[in-house]
Structure formats: structure tokens, C-alpha cells
């Protein structure tokens, strides 16, 4: 830590400015008020599309960074309000239309439902039998499992949460208006990164985790322990009363009684004295290091989760005291930046990280680009942990929820990462000043861009040719009836030795990585089968030739996505083809008339193309996950302890040919969605067709050019003129960029909804 003389600290001064900027609907009610041209009203039909395109482009409304910052800050509160309203809706459905209590009473036989379809013209067929006499639509969001983890024991509590979330939404809306129209932060407040880091690290993450750990210890852990005992058929006794049903469990506020809590966790009786005297072992019954999964619920131990949050809290509270604010002590981010001189081998930059501090505190696009890339990566990591280390009770045996959560977190991650590239490119076009980045690391990366992109291109060709080549070889050999010449576990074996080594290392490390951990980090890494209610919750995952092959397809598609996105960022300002690209802006269709062969070079077009490859990459990932789990992990446990897997372990032999993927996965598992009519999954059958249509509709926008439509429109306008019904607003074809945007939006929406219907109809029936 840098200890500086006291004069280096800055005096605290007001960071907020009182503004007289009344919130008036006179202004907001006027479409296009933010743009002089749009405010004049529509002359052509392009007006409405430009309105949509530019409404949230605050940079285009004003060049005043403080004003832009205030608008973004205010919009964040609006976003939070929408989230609270959305949460309130989820809680309300749980309170009013769900079988939550029924599910809590028998989670292995009752399916979760929080939606009941009302009969109007026969759609009550969609209400399936959820068990225990409840008819409804099965949900796959995992909310019931989360609520049980929080310690919610009744629909009444959910209704209280629904009301509370609406109150919070109101507060957020109020805050958004107040901090823009009444008391708005000054620019220096937004740029005070040390203070922001201290507050976010120590406050949001540190104290947030600590208070959550408090909830887990005082509410979640005791409620979970009592429920687990009921589910295991060995109910516990509290104050001489047997807790035989969920209704018998004390309400959260009753656990304020320390004596009551100490009956479940004697360590609570040690009080706070044990903490200050260093006798932390007294707490080892509710802050545990068990590892593995709870055999009753197939989820991580609640006391392990509480311990984790205490540890996270300590780390982040310490981290939140590292940065220099009003006192001359701690790190300065600017000094840290300027002390870094870059990588001496890869990017020897004489000026190191000089100028990056200013770039990141004046370009919110640059900041957002980094944050989206990291948050997207985090979402993808969450997807992997949902099955490898399931945190919520009974979630691991709710296969539809597991597929749903994996798919959801993968898509979210993909979109955020592409968004990261988009905002990085916008930052390069709008905010990057080459004069301020001479020979620093960013400049050196830009100077090396040809080497970076050409190498990445070579990697993509190598991965694509070899990984696809393995499949082509196998399809050819199988077609010719030569199984002995195929790449497979039983013929020419290619084992993923590095992945197997990682699995073994994790399995062997139990007991040595964490103090006295009783089990390994995940059963997926060479652990043992955990069965709950006769279904597999977790099991060791065997890896072989089929996994090796599809893994390299993943490597190929991810690298192509990175190639497209990175090329868009590195060539956003200029290229050999268009040296003055920065002057043309973030999105432009081509470099003007008379300059052919310059289409699809804008940074926006790279985002557009990157989205397709992101979709491509993740489709293969979620198909791989879905099939692998059904083949090698999920299934029912027989009386002799053997496992009957859903697809009987066919992955290793079928996933090594393209024909196998098409026939034994896509076609075989589409049986349920194609045959769903007349059953309670028929909505997915219709959705499967409808989403295919939306996907196909996108191709009309992607394959045809603007001129085709403009010609057609002019002929239609002629007919209107003939009939004297000409419109006052002149019809215009979508611009080239708008057409592509509509195309990619429908392509992704159609593709994702098709996959959703395909997964659901299948796994709801067989899972």
C-alpha cells in the first residue's frame, strides 16, 4: 500500500448540484424532442425507425459529458424499477397461482407450477398434472428452489415480497426523477473512481455479502435444516414440539430468539464473545467446510454457503479500504495505471498505461465494454456451476430447470460479451483520441492489429479444418461400413487427457485444499453418484473421444466469434481499405456511392456478424450440454444401484458423426415437440413452428437489398396515387443497416424460441 503525505488527500466537497429542471410531460410527450430533425415530426416513414434508433443514444443528443452521465445514472434507477416490477410479478404468481406449498411438502414428486391457464377456447389443455391434485403449467425458472433456499415457507410470505418489490420499484422511480431533476451528481462524482471502488467493494459486495450471510445463518440454515429433516422422514424437535410439516416451522422473526436457534446450531449459543476471543471453532456447526452435496436435497450444504458468504464479505470489506480518497492513504488508480509499463515481451510500450485512466473516466463506452465482457463471462461461468455445484435444494433433479438455467445463462453471457465488443468499438470511434495514446499499450495493440488478426484467422482455419475434418472422416468411414477406422473410444481413440487430469486433480485434492473438507469440490469431477428420490442429482462425468471432438468445435466457433468482434474493435477507426473510417461513424452501410466493395466494414456490421457466430457457438454448447447430461449423468437409479440414463449413454458412439448429431440428437429428441398436439405440451409444438417462421422471416431481410424494396414501394405508391389515397407521410424502405438489424433480431429471436420449445417439450416429457 502507498502511504502518502497528508496533503495528497483531497478535501471533501459537495458532489451534488441542486438543479431546477422540472419533470414535465410537455417535453417528454413530444416524440423526438431530443433531436432537432426528429422533433419536426415525420415527413417519411424513416422517422419512426430513426426515433427508435436514436432515443437512447445520449451521445447524439448532447456532447456534455456531465449531462450524458446524469441521464445514464437516472436511467439506471428506471431499469431497477422495471426489475423490481418484474420480480413483483414473479412473487405474485408464486403467491396467487402456484403450488409452492404443495411442492415444499413433496419436492421429489410434485412439479413446480406458478401459472394456471383459464379456459376460454379450450386452452386449459395446457394445464398438466403437477402432482398432489394441482393442474397448471410447469415452470423451469428455478424460482421455487431459490425461495426454499431463502427460507420462504408460505404463499403469504411471497405476497408480502410482491408488495415489497412494488414499493421498491416506486422508490427507484422516485430516485431516478430526484437525481436528475432535483439534485443531480456533478461530473467529478461520476469520475471519482477511488470512492466508487471503496463503496462498491466494501458496501455493495462486502456488507451485502455479510448481511446475506446473516440471513443465511439466522433464517435459511435453520429453516432448511428443519425442512431437510422432514423430507428425510426424521423430523426435528424444537422446544419440545415435533416439526412434522412445513407449517410447523417457526416464522423468521421467531429465530431472533437465540435459545431457539441454539437448539439447531449450538454454536449460536456461544454468542459474539467467541468471535472477539478468537474461539472461532465454536461456530463450526453453522459455518462449515463439508464439500460435496447434501444427500437429502442434492444441493450444496446451506452451512457451506453461509461460510462462503462470510469469507467473501471479509475479502471485499478489506478490498474496499484500499483506495485513496479524502485521506492521504491508499492506492491511486491513476498512479497504478501510470506505474504499469506493459508486457516487455509482447507489447513493449514506452508509455505503458499512460492515458488509460483518462480514457476510462471520460469514455463510458470503454468502461461499459470492459464491464459487459466480464459480466458476460461471469454469466457463462454461472451456467457451468448450476449443474456442477447445484446451490438450491432439489434443483439438480429437476432436469427441465437445469437445462433451462444452463441455456439461459449461456445466452445471457453471449449477448453481454457481444455487447462488450459493441461498446468497445463505439468507444474507439467516438471517444478515442490518438494524440493522447502515443506508444501506450492500447496504441501498441492497435499497431500490432494486423499480426493479431492474421494469427487469429490462422487459428480459426486450423481449428475449423481439423475439428470438422474429424467428423467428416468419421461420417465417411461409417457410411462405408468401416467402424474400425473411425475416431472413437473403441477404435482410434483420442482421449481428452488434460481434461481428465483436471478431473482427477480435483477429486484427489479433497481434504487438502480446504481445511478438513469432507468431500471434493464437485461430484462431476470423479466423485460419486448422488441420488435424490431415485433420480441422479450429480455423478462423475466420463470424458472420451466424442467430448474431445465437440470441444474442438467449441474452440473453433468461439475463436471465429472473437475474430469478428476483435476485428471490429481494432479496425473501428481505420483500415487499409477505408483509412478515414472514424469519420464515417460507428454504423454506416458502405463508403458512399462510387466506392464499391466497401459494404459491411463498419464497427456496427462486425457486431451484426458477431451475433450470428455467437448464436452458432452457443447453440452447439447447449446442444452438447443437453445431450451429454441426458446420456451420461441424468436418469433413474435402479434397485441394484445401477443408473438407467435418459438416452442410455448413446453420446460416446453417436456424437462422433454429423449424421449422429442430426439423427440421434436433433431428430430423436424432436419427437416430443412434433407429436405434442393434443397434449399439455402442445403450446411448445405451436411455438416450435411459430419460432421457425420468425427465423425464416429474418432471411427475407438478410438476403434482399434495400433497392429491391424501394422499387416495390414506389410501384405501390403509384397505385395509391392512381386511386387518390396517397399517404401524407412518404413511404421509404428501411435503410440497409435497419434491414440488417431487423434481420438479425428475428434470426436470434426465432432461433432461441425454437430451441426453447424443442428443449422444453422433450425434457418435460422424459425428464
From Swiss-Prot:
Protein residues bound to phylloquinone: 709
Subcellular location: Cellular thylakoid membrane
Disulfide-bonded cysteines: none
Taxonomy, superkingdom: Bacteria
Ligand binding (chlorophyll a): 700, 708
InterPro entries: PSI_PsaA, PSI_PsaA/B, PSI_PsaA/B_CS, PSI_PsaA/B_sf
Keyword Electron transport belongs to the record: yes
Primary location class: membrane
A GO MF label: oxidoreductase activity
Membrane topology: Multi-pass membrane protein
Gene Ontology annotations for the cellular component aspect, listed alphabetically: photosystem I; plasma membrane-derived thylakoid membrane
Protein EC: 1.97.1.12
Substrates-to-products reaction catalysed: reduced [plastocyanin] + hnu + oxidized [2Fe-2S]-[ferredoxin] = oxidized [plastocyanin] + reduced [2Fe-2S]-[ferredoxin]
Residues that bind [4Fe-4S] cluster: 590, 599
Cofactor-binding details, from the entry: PSI electron transfer chain: 5 chlorophyll a, 1 chlorophyll a', 2 phylloquinones and 3 4Fe-4S clusters. PSI core antenna: 90 chlorophyll a, 22 carotenoids, 3 phospholipids and 1 galactolipid. P700 is a chlorophyll a/chlorophyll a' dimer, A0 is one or more chlorophyll a, A1 is one or both phylloquinones and FX is a shared 4Fe-4S iron-sulfur center.
A biological-process GO annotation: photosynthesis
Annotated chlorophyll a' binding sites: 692
Keywords: 4Fe-4S, Chlorophyll, Chromophore, Electron transport, Iron, Iron-sulfur, Magnesium, Membrane, Metal-binding, Oxidoreductase, Photosynthesis, Photosystem I, Thylakoid, Transmembrane, Transmembrane helix, Transport
Entries under HAMAP family matching the protein: PSI_PsaA
Role played: PsaA and PsaB bind P700, the primary electron donor of photosystem I (PSI), as well as the electron acceptors A0, A1 and FX. PSI is a plastocyanin/cytochrome c6-ferredoxin oxidoreductase, converting photonic excitation into a charge separation, which transfers an electron from the donor P700 chlorophyll pair to the spectroscopically characterized acceptors A0, A1, FX, FA and FB in turn. Oxidized P700 is reduced on the lumenal side of the thylakoid membrane by plastocyanin or cytochrome c6.
Family stated for the protein in its record: Belongs to the PsaA/PsaB family.
SUBUNIT field: The PsaA/B heterodimer binds the P700 chlorophyll special pair and subsequent electron acceptors. PSI consists of a core antenna complex that captures photons, and an electron transfer chain that converts photonic excitation into a charge separation. The cyanobacterial PSI reaction center is composed of one copy each of PsaA,B,C,D,E,F,I,J,K,L,M and X, and forms trimeric complexes.
The protein, known as: Photosystem I P700 chlorophyll a apoprotein A1
Organism of provenance: Parasynechococcus marenigrum (strain WH8102)
Amino acid at each position: 500500500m502507498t502511504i502518502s503525505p497528508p496533503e495528497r488527500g483531497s478535501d471533501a466537497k459537495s458532489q451534488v448540484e441542486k438543479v431546477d429542471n422540472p419533470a414535465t410531460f410537455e417535453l417528454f410527450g413530444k416524440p423526438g424532442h431530443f433531436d432537432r430533425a426528429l422533433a419536426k415530426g415525420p415527413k417519411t416513414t424513416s422517422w419512426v425507425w430513426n426515433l427508435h434508433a436514436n432515443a437512447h443514444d445520449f451521445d447524439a443528443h448532447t456532447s456534455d459529458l456531465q449531462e450524458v452521465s446524469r441521464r445514464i445514472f437516472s436511467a439506471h434507477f428506471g431499469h431497477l424499477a422495471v426489475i423490481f416490477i418484474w420480480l413483483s410479478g414473479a412473487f405474485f404468481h408464486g403467491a396467487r397461482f402456484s403450488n409452492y406449498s404443495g411442492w415444499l411438502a413433496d419436492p421429489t414428486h410434485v412439479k413446480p407450477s406458478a401459472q394456471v391457464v383459464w379456459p376460454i377456447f379450450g386452452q386449459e389443455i395446457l394445464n398438466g398434472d403437477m402432482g398432489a391434485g394441482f393442474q397448471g403449467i410447469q415452470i423451469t425458472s428455478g424460482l421455487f428452489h431459490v425461495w426454499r433456499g431463502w427460507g420462504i415457507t408460505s404463499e403469504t410470505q411471497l405476497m408480502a415480497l410482491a408488495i415489497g418489490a412494488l414499493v421498491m420499484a416506486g422508490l427507484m422511480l422516485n430516485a431516478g426523477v430526484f437525481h436528475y431533476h432535483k439534485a443531480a451528481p456533478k461530473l467529478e462524482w461520476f469520475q471519482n473512481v477511488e470512492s466508487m471502488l471503496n463503496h462498491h467493494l466494501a458496501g455493495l459486495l462486502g456488507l451485502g455479502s455479510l448481511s446475506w450471510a446473516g440471513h443465511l445463518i439466522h433464517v435459511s440454515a435453520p429453516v432448511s435444516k428443519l425442512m431437510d429433516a422432514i423430507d428425510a422422514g426424521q423430523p426435528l424437535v424444537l422446544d419440545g414440539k415435533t416439526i412434522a410439516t412445513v407449517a410447523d416451522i417457526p416464522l423468521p422473526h421467531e429465530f431472533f430468539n437465540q435459545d431457539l436457534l441454539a437448539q439447531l446450531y449450538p454454536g449460536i449459543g456461544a454468542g459474539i464473545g467467541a468471535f472477539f476471543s478468537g474461539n472461532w471453532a465454536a461456530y463450526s456447526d453453522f459455518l462449515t467446510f463439508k464439500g460435496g452435496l447434501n444427500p437429502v436435497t442434492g444441493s450444496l450444504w446451506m452451512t457451506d454457503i453461509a461460510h462462503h458468504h462470510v469469507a467473501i464479505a471479509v475479502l471485499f470489506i478489506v478490498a474496499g479500504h484500499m483506495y485513496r480518497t479524502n485521506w492521504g492513504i491508499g492506492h491511486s488508480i491513476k498512479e497504478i495505471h501510470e506505474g504499469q509499463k506493459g508486457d516487455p515481451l509482447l507489447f513493449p510500450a514506452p508509455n505503458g498505461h499512460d492515458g488509460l485512466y483518462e480514457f476510462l473516466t471520460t469514455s463510458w463506452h470503454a468502461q461499459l465494454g470492459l464491464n459487459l465482457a466480464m459480466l458476460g463471462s461471469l454469466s457463462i461461468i454461472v451456467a457451468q456451476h448450476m449443474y456442477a455445484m447445484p446451490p438450491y435444494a432439489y434443483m439438480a433433479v429437476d432436469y427441465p430447470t437445469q437445462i433451462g438455467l444452463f441455456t439461459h445463462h449461456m445466452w445471457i453471457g453471449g449477448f453481454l460479451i457481444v455487447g462488450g465488443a459493441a461498446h468497445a468499438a463505439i468507444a474507439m470511434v467516438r471517444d478515442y483520441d490518438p494524440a493522447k495514446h502515443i506508444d501506450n499499450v492500447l496504441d501498441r495493440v492497435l499497431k500490432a492489429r494486423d499480426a493479431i488478426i492474421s494469427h487469429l484467422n490462422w487459428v480459426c482455419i486450423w481449428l475449423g479444418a481439423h475439428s470438422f475434418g474429424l467428423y467428416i472422416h468419421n461420417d465417411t468411414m461409417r457410411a462405408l461400413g468401416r467402424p474400425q477406422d473411425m475416431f472413437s473410444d473403441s477404435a482410434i481413440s483420442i482421449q481428452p487427457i488434460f481434461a481428465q487430469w483436471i478431473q482427477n486433480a480435483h477429486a484427489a485434492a479433497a481434504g487438502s485444499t480446504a481445511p478438513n473438507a469432507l468431500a471434493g469440490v464437485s461430484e462431476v469431477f470423479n466423485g460419486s453418484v448422488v441420488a435424490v428420490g431415485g433420480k441422479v442429482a450429480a455423478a462423475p462425468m466420463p470424458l472420451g473421444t466424442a467430448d474431445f471432438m465437440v470441444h474442438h468445435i467449441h474452440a473453433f466457433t468461439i475463436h471465429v466469434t472473437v475474430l469478428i468482434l476483435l476485428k471490429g474493435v481494432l479496425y473501428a477507426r481505420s483500415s487499409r481499405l477505408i483509412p478515414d473510417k472514424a469519420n464515417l461513424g460507428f454504423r454506416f452501410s458502405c463508403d458512399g456511392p462510387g466506392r464499391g466493395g466497401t459494404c459491411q466494414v463498419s464497427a456496427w456490421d462486425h457486431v451484426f456478424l458477431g451475433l450470428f457466430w455467437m448464436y452458432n457457438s452457443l447453440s452447439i454448447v447447449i446442444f452438447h450440454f443437453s445431450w451429454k447430461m441426458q446420456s451420461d449423468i441424468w436418469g433413474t437409479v435402479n434397485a441394484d444401484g445401477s443408473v438407467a440414463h435418459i438416452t442410455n449413454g448413446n453420446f460416446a458412439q453417436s456424437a462422433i458423426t454429423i449424421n449422429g448429431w442430426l439423427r440421434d440428437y436433433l431428430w430423436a429428441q424432436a419427437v416430443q415437440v412434433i407429436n405434442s398436439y393434443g397434449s399439455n405440451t402442445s403450446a411448445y409444438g405451436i411455438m416450435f413452428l411459430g419460432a421457425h417462421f420468425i427465423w425464416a422471416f429474418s432471411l427475407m431481410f438478410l438476403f434482399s437489398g434495400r433497392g429491391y424494396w424501394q422499387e416495390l414501394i414506389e410501384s405501390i405508391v403509384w397505385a395509391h396515387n392512381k386511386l387518390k389515397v396517397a399517404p401524407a407521410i412518404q413511404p421509404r424502405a428501411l435503410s440497409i443497416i435497419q434491414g440488417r438489424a431487423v434481420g438479425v433480431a428475428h434470426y436470434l429471436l426465432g432461433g432461441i424460441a425454437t430451441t426453447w420449445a424443442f428443449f422444453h417439450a422433450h425434457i418435460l416429457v422424459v425428464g
